[in-house]
């Protein structure tokens, strides 16, 4: 009886083991460019594009936020989702700040799922470390009846609604015509124009200075050349004078020699005459 019970228990355990082995887990698939093993393929869904939020896509808004300016990265983890949600639902993005930084943000947004039909406008400025982003999804037509709403995106708080609300950077964005933002951008453009004019004037001054230096160098070379020619002429004249002096000296020496020779000849004749007169 005990033996039969033991056999029955063993058979039951064997059946359970075989049943468990027959329902083995499905093999997981390792995706490319990943060092970890993901979940089963049944749980992986791929989308051709990120869907829009029904409320945000139908709500006109203009949002201005001051994006961070970290050295090694752009956004904190807690800021990424909300910022991309804002960017993805916008029709127009204006980035104001350092030229390299705003270009990094633009490329970052476009490379990480932002809609391809978003219009990006870059406004580079000097002496501004951070980046200001103005995002809107409403019609820019001043006759439009759409009124934008303001959201404190990076803080993740509730929408700040109302006629006199202000966003993070202190601008009133409750109306479709954001005069303060427009004036700020206009001031930035005027500043850039002044800077461009300054560098243009500086370049013209440098070109004028270079031209003046070249002219001075040419005048100096001409002066040195004239002096060298004058010195050469003086040397030639001096050489001619020296040569003429030598010739005159030689002529005088020759004249002296001739006179001496004539004196010797005269003395010789006088001696001959004296000898004849004395009868010797």
Curated annotation (Swiss-Prot):
> What is the membrane topology listed in the Swiss-Prot or TrEMBL record?
Lipid-anchor
Instruction: Report the locations given in the UniProt record.
Output: Cell membrane
Q: Where is the lipid attached (N-palmitoyl cysteine)?
A: 21
Entry's Pfam families?
Cag12
The positions making up the signal sequence are 1-20
- Keyword Cell membrane in the entry? The reply is yes
BP term (GO), one = protein secretion
Q: Which domain of life is it from?
A: Bacteria
Which keywords label this protein? Cell membrane, Lipoprotein, Membrane, Palmitate, Signal
Q: Which InterPro entries match?
A: Cag12
GO CC terms for this protein?
A: outer membrane; plasma membrane
Covalently attached lipid (S-diacylglycerol cysteine), positions: 21
What this protein is called in its record is CAG pathogenicity island protein 12
**What's the name of its gene?**
cagT
